[in-house]
Amino acid sequence: MTEPVVTRFAPSPTGFLHIGGARTALFNWLYARKQGGKMLLRIEDTDRERSTDAAIKAILDGLNWLGIEWDGEVIYQFSRAARHREVAEQLLAEGKAYRCYATPEELTKMREAARAEGRAVRYDGRWRDRDPSEAPADVKPVIRLKAPQTGETVIEDQVQGRVVWQNENLDDLVLLRSDGTPTYMLAVVVDDHDMGVTHVIRGDDHLINAARQKHIYDALGWTVPTMAHIPLIHGPDGSKLSKRHGALGVEAYRTMGYLPAALRNYLVRLGWSHGDQEIFSTSEMIEAFELSGIGRSAARFDFAKLENLNGHYMRASGDAELVKAFEDILQFLPQGPALQAKLNDTTRAQLLQAMPGLKERAKTLLELIDSAAYIFADRPLALDAKASAVLTPQVRALLGELRSSLANVTDWNAANTEAAMRAYAEKNNLKLGAVAQPLRAALTGRTTSPGIFDVLAVLGRDDALARLQDQAA
């Protein structure tokens, strides 16, 4: 019987959950769900100077917002330091590791000499076979692994294929620092083993770590997990992802008005494919996800593609669902408190009524909020420059007449207000646009808006007529 699949997402809490980390978490989660296994969450907080509680909160919030659920309690790596030291001492006792008394000055000279000679920088093993009796009394040692010095180290990677390193190019890595704290390399191996991790899915910037970590696994006689090193995400031009390209924290995408389902769908297609399918529900992702579908080349981040995909999800979302999303995002926006204060039973009902038209036009929640601004506008409306230019004295006189025509509409809805407008335009030999544009400017303060008949219906008779009165001559 095969053992159950256990994956892990193991971020360092030194910053927000960036977009590459979010994709790594998603791939781990999808693979675990596809295989009926578990995804664990381990916070690698051994760098005590750079790890922050704010970053931990941002990581947990980001995963929750994206709908990526981990199994069990969050594991904090630093809390396991005693276990890591125990393993280092075990290797020392078994003769598979040794105390190294090289001073920082010696190591600096070693590095400088290697660079001057054009050699790779690596520890030269000077304390590997020396008698401990030669140890200087005033130097606290580190503990180093006795790595193999000949032959090769091979990783059969599920994405990169067979990757081979010559052992002569890999040095004796530090397991325990001179202050007794474990290194990242040791902590990761011990934690993955103790947590029963069967598959390590992470960025290919960790590929060299895989070779070095395999040396630790082999020294301990532990099974090496299946490895899958996924390509990094690049900008649209193929360069390293920068903030202008999209190298932002997940919380920034939330604030920019993207829906979690859309971002999840976009991320799964960054470097993974399943035929030519672009749109995936969560259940479809889980059903289709295989490590073999991950490509070896870097994926390119494309904001326009994300925006279009988000637009698709906006249009496919239920109206009430979008009203909730509208409210949820306000806490993250500068104008949020002012809008929140205006949300009441009336404006919520208007927003829900307007939503079919709003979501057809908006690609993000920010665009949706902007298009819905007329619902929350205070009278008399502030007009933008284009709307002011439309409302000439002659047009303002027209608005007064148009208001009188609309005031005769008893059953106030989009169809009846449209009929009244068309009748007015026909009676006065005007094109519909010559009536609709001034109406739009007076009702919304802008020259672009959702369908003007929908605007009339959403505002209701009293508010619409009052806004027209405000602008009429």
From Swiss-Prot:
PROSITE patterns linked to this entry: AA_TRNA_LIGASE_I
A GO cellular component annotated for this chain's UniProt record is: cytosol
Q: What class of enzyme is it?
A: ligase
Q: Does the keyword Iron-sulfur apply?
A: no
One Gene Ontology MF term:
tRNA binding
Keyword rRNA-binding tagged:
no
The protein's matches in PANTHER family, at most eight in alphabetical order, are given as:
GLUTAMATE--TRNA LIGASE (PTHR43311), GLUTAMATE--TRNA LIGASE, MITOCHONDRIAL-RELATED (PTHR43311:SF2)
Name under which the protein is recorded: Glutamate--tRNA ligase
Q: Which organism is it from?
A: Afipia carboxidovorans (strain ATCC 49405 / DSM 1227 / KCTC 32145 / OM5) (Oligotropha carboxidovorans)
Source organism lineage? Bacteria, Pseudomonadati, Pseudomonadota, Alphaproteobacteria, Hyphomicrobiales
